[in-house]
Structure formats: C-alpha cells, structure tokens
Amino acid sequence: MNEGNSLRDIQKKITLPEEFNQPYLVSSYDDFTFLINSVWRQYGGWYSGIPSELKPPSLFEIGNAYIDMAGGKENLLLFLESLLAEKKYKEASVIIDAISAVEPDFYRDLKNSIYSFLADQEPSLMAKGIYNFNIDT
C-alpha cells in the first residue's frame, strides 16, 4: 500500500509462505484474498487505488459500451464463448456482470455457465455461495 500499489495488484502479489501450505491449514470458509481486502479496508479505506472505480458508471452503461464495442450482442456472445474455451472464466465474469444488466435474458445461460463453473472450482464456501447465488434459475 505504501508503495502505491492498487488493491488488485496487492491481491496478485501477496501469497502465503510455503510453511502455511499444510492440509490442516486449508481454508474452507474464507479465502486469503478476502483477508487482504479486509486489511486494505481497515488501513486504506474504501478507495481501491484504481481511479476508474472512484465514480464508476453503472453496470448498464458499461454493458452497453461492451456491446457497442463488440459490434452487437451476438458478437459479444461469440467473444465470451471464446474466453470460456480458453478457460478465462474470471475475465468473462467481469464482462457478463455488465452486459447482463443490459440484456439479462439473452446472456442468462452463459452467465449461469460462468458462475456455475467458478462455484465448482472454488474451495472457499463464502465465494462458492456468492457465485451460486448469482445463478439465475
């Protein structure tokens, strides 16, 4: 934080020491990333260090920008499917959150696939619950 790193940068840089990689220390409820978030909020406050997150546009506005940039919702669907083929589910989840605000019915199945996959891969019960909660039935 004192070096000017953003929260996202810190989340990628900090890892637990190898001696904590023990079967009896596996976290099943929480996640190490969530602990980093808590420390950031305690000492750094609510600002993530990323200027675009200071006063962000709505997900609806971002979703429209993604759809326009792709040349339409069908092109964006193809792009997202290519991300999934490359196993880039987290990247796809950022986009699907925004475009689902614009076209929830059109992207519902893809959104459900993304969050179902992420939930299945997640060891943290907290993250698993959040991913599953966002699956539309």
Region locations from a protein language model:
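Accessory terminal helices/loops
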Residues: M1-T137
